């Protein structure tokens, strides 16, 4: 079976972290985010195509050096082609039912059940669906007996046909490729799905977790889900000392801790947290939080220092930065 992973965006919503790396390689629970996508592919997948447009050589080198037990080909887009164009780019290589995954999404969709649903309905295309409270930022569907009758992209909440949204996981038959015009940017959501709804487009609602990890809030939510899903732990090579660990945390080797850590905290290798507080945050490799500082709801880049008494909340701080003593960084992006 074949799979396409859509990782072609610039990662603007996670800047400045993506100034130095493609979004597919942004660490999530101390592993490149794209690996969490591969973890959840159907076991039958033995060939995958990763569509990228930003820093393609970095992605290509990563897969060349990483053995996933799957034949991976990186397909470079000279310019972003949208979700549909990226799928069409693999057209000459697709020969059977295939899976498409949005590279930003972290979820618990049951792919074996999803595939069984697709085949039972003899669907041309199937979309995994997730119910959300506010559907206005997503593609929303209307359904009858499992079949999608209407697909509306980002409707006002009061006009949404349901609260079931496109979860960014698809199963397609090769014939779907005929619905995508070649040589230009094409949106599956606004151009292809509405046409497929007339031909045989089915929706597979699922429970469990789902998050768009391409935003700060979504990234931290995804980390929380993964920590709860058997992702927490403390490496034996970490020096925890008298640090207080609250709730689910993941602490890598070489960390030296003496503050209050957690809940929902991920520390990359070699991090140091003095008598400080870190909550609902990720600190990447080599980051330091000095005495009296507070980090909440944030991502701290590699080799970055949060100085004594500083506060970082709801922010992204890039690699190699220094938050000076006593500074308050609130809802900012700091390079």
Question: Across the structure, where does each feature detected by a protein language model lie?
Answer:
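Conserved beta-loop-beta/alpha segment of the NTase-like Rossmann-fold superfamily
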Residues: 43, 59-145, 181
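Catalytic-core segments of class I nucleotidyltransferases/pyrophosphorylases
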Residues: 98-99, 106, 112-119, 132-133, ...
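Short internal beta-strands
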Residues: 47-53, 128-129, 299, 316
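A structural signal for short hydrophobic beta-strand segments in well-ordered beta-sheet cores
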Residues: 25, 140-143, 193, 203
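Extended, small-residue-rich solenoid/repeat segments and analogous flexible loops
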Residues: 197-286
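N-terminal glycine-rich phosphate-binding loop and ensuing alpha1 helix
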Residues: 1-60
